[in-house]
Amino acid sequence: MKTFKTRMSQAVLTFTATSALAITSAGVAVADDTPDSPSPDASGSVLSGEFVLPGIDVPPFSGESNADGSNPFYVPPETLPEGKGTVIRSQDAPNLLNLESNGGPGSAERILYTTTNEHGEQVATSGAVLKPTGKWQGKGPAPTLVATPGTRGAGDICAPSRSSYQLYGFDDGNGAINLNYEYPFHAAASALGMNVVVVDLIGLGTPGQHTYVNHLEEGTAALDGARAGLSHLGLPEDSPIGFFGYSQGGGASAAAAEQASSYAPELNVKGTFAGAPPADLIEVVDYVDDHAITGVIGFALNGALERHSDLTGLQDEYFNDQGKQFMADTKDRCIGDAVGRWAFTDTRTMTKDGRSFGEIARSDERLSEVLDSYKLANRYKNLNAPMLMVNGKNDDTIPWQQARDTAARYCEAGGTVQFNTDPLPEVLPGFVINHAVPMLTQAGPAMNYLVDRFNDKPAPSNCGKF
């Protein structure tokens, strides 16, 4: 039965990625020559229409493949340059919009840049910068979309920027597979005339463990990614930007939005889309236990141990041999292969006393304090720009209530927030369908929302009504 459920889960992930990639081949609509924002079609999406990607032959495909996941580009110098968001180096990154990476429309480059971790220490992280293929038809200068990735995994090979043609990568050492399933959304923004900066987040691609769903670090990495991207593109630091992310990326975008006024006040943030954010990790851990993506619990715990060495002893204290194997295995897995290895594993089978990881997280003050510090709209609450937050009422991965409560806290702090509920009925709970499908159906309305913010249209808000 578990084998069937695992295969079914992998099929769902494959379908979601394929559906997203179909957006690229189907094309996106580009606004006409008016100063107004693009007109949505009947579905409310700008992600449909007649735009066709450049018709050029794709060279023989080969994803990055390194037995140890290493790549010299991602290894920072021993001494980092001063400043936050300082570009250390760049490298051409051919992609479907410009296979020659010739500096023209649609060309992309990887960047390695500086940021800070939760302890205020300077570290290097990476990302990619994608130039527009279309002309910005809206108000003012072409904006920059800062895209924060949904869950890719914990291994270096899983980083979006490390994928060949910004699509795919493979670690032949452990079989980890990187599928850049959000590339179509980046291509859509490029077609609308936006610059796109895709951040990898700390430890994903670069040395050290990826600090998965550590919102303190995801926020700084995204803000410094904006700084680095603008600098690399030769744009003023007050150029209009917006944050766009779903799932892990939704949490990262929200984290950037709430830290922007204190960490990067010079940035001209126009708006944020935070889709299905894992805002309260202690609530989320119960949802993903005995679930298709149980492996993400390992991603999160390994990330917490990376920053809090005092928690290392928890493994010997609580985990049995299977639990320790789970922790070791998920350190460098990507999400697809983590499903293949750990789908529908009940964490009670991995602890010495039969308690779940969630029960342990609630009862151990050391662990609960760390996870609580990553909670959104907690330490930082003040947004300096409007936000659209969306969560499925029946999302089987990210609880609707914790997202709703997060939006409410932003409202209470004076934020302009539109909180929307995706109405998809419950479908095969635990198989990620109710989490993955809204990523596709809400992408168009989310892009429209940001286009309106870039055009200085009044932002909607339903604070006090949800």
Q: Which residues fall in each region the model found?
A:
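Catalytic-loop region of hydrolases
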Residues: 30-136
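Primarily recognizes the serine-hydrolase "nucleophile elbow" in alpha/beta-hydrolase
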Residues: 227-297
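C-terminal catalytic histidine-bearing segment of alpha/beta-hydrolase fold enzymes
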Residues: 363-364, 368-370, 394, 411-466
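Alpha/beta-hydrolase active-site loop
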Residues: 181-184, 191, 212-233
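Short alpha-helix in the alpha/beta-hydrolase fold that links the catalytic acid
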Residues: 385-386, 399-409
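Short beta-strand/loop motif that positions the catalytic acidic residue
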Residues: 383, 388-395
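Short, surface-exposed "cap/lid" segments of acyl-processing enzymes
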Residues: 117-126, 130-192
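Accessory cap/linker subdomain of secreted extracellular hydrolases
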Residues: 41, 46-71, 78, 278-380
